[in-house]
Curated annotation (Swiss-Prot):
One of its GO terms (molecular function) is voltage-gated monoatomic anion channel activity. GO terms for cellular component: plasma membrane. Residues 47-73, 128-131, 190-199, 257, 313-321 are extracellular. This is S-type anion channel SLAH4. The gene is SLAH4.
Length: 365
């Protein structure tokens, strides 16, 4: 008589080990996510804080001139700009530590190198719009030098390359983003003038304006560098009127009044703005898909609005008041629109920008 064999299956509950494995996977995933964010981040993201800081400066001036405007909006905007700037600075500092090779690659890129000025510009604007620091205080002066020294250092490196390095002539490397370096010097000049350092302000202003004229003439000739500018970055064309608008602001602070030179620079920026607005096809392809470059629409308009405010204060007629109202309203509306679009497209915000990492210069393609 045969006894039927029976198989006994023993099931071991390994939920504890699975939980440990899941925790380990999450712990391993967190550094991967951070490194992914850092690898996607570049200095062009400081366009966001640049827009916030310039908007805070506009609101500071407007609240001072028109007491009926809510001062709470200015304070909230300034603290939002501060939080954004600090966050971006920390992230970019981590990138410099962990992904320094990518930072060097960005420094070598004919477009990316210009946005290395953006953190300093944002900090200088944040300082000038600060509600609690007086321009003549020691803290203001100390922070000014901390933010201005990187600008002068980059000037020495970048401008020197244009006439000493064999493969990096301005005629080859020039592109609309090259005007960011000019804006950095002019914003620093305004900051120095606010402290009463007239000689320092004139030095920075002359440095910025000389290079602006050279860059503007180079770009006006449509040399090879401009033809290599990517379509997705065409919002950066708004820098064409941002540079003379910033120069007008700086000269107004140096002289203490909106004189003839300041008016000429304002009219130049106004003319270039109208010229760009009359050519919507130039920007049509760049707005098909969201890109962080869209923030380049915001801060140039804000600089133009700041100019219109100063112009209205000097001229005091109906046309000047209408210009101030139009550009101030336009600045706020564009700023809010871009901010809402950024929130709606947050998943696309930190995608790797293949434009900036595709080549180191026009001749490298």
């Amino acid at each position: 008589m045969e006894i039927p064999s029976q198989e006994i299956h023993i099931m071991i509950d390994n939920t504890i080990s699975r939980r440990k494995e899941r925790k380990t996977n999450l712990a391993d995933a967190e550094p991967i996510v951070l490194m992914s964010v850092l690898s996607s981040l570049h200095a062009g993201y400081f366009r966001i804080s640049l827009s916030l800081c310039s908007q805070a400066l506009l609101w500071k001036i407007m609240v001072h001139l028109h007491s009926e405007l809510p001062s709470m909006a200015y304070y909230l905007l300034w603290y939002l700009a501060l939080a954004t700037q600090v966050s971006l600075c920390f992230l970019y500092a981590f990138k410099c530590i962990f992904l320094f090779d990518m930072v060097k690659e960005e420094f070598s890129h004919y477009i990316g190198v210009n946005y290395l000025y953006a953190p300093s510009i944002s900090c200088l604007l944040l300082l000038q719009s600060a509600p609690m620091i007086e321009p003549h205080s020691v803290l203001y002066q100390t922070l000014f030098w901390i933010f201005a020294v990187p600008v002068l250092t980059l000037d020495t490196k970048l401008y020197g390359q244009w006439f000493t390095t064999e493969k990096r002539f301005l005629s080859i490397m020039a592109n609309p983003a090259s005007q960011v370096s000019v804006i950095a010097n002019l914003v620093a000049a305004r900051g120095a003038a606010e402290m009463g350092w007239k000689e320092c302000a004139l030095c920075l202003f002359s440095l910025g304006m000389v290079h602006y004229l050279v860059i503007f003439v180079t770009l006006y000739q449509r040399l090879p560098g401009g033809n290599n500018f990517p379509t997705t970055l065409r919002p950066v064309f708004f820098l064409f009127f941002a540079a003379p608008a910033t120069a007008s602001l700086a000269w107004n602070s140096i002289c203490g009044n909106f004189d003839t030179i300041a008016k000429m620079l304002f009219f130049l920026s106004l003319f270039i703005f109208i010229s760009l607005v009359c050519r919507p096809n130039l920007l049509k392809k760049s707005i098909k898909r969201f890109n962080v470059a869209w923030w380049a629409y915001s801060f140039p308009i804000t600089f133009l609005a700041l100019n219109s405010v100063q112009y209205a204060q000097e001229v005091k007629d109906h046309v000047a008041s209408v210009l101030m109202f139009i550009f101030s309203s336009m600045s706020v509306l564009i700023f809010i629109s871009v901010m809402l679009l950024t929130a709606a497209n947050s998943k696309r915000l930190l995608r790797r920008d293949h434009v900036l990492w595709s080549s180191t210069g026009p001749k490298d393609k």
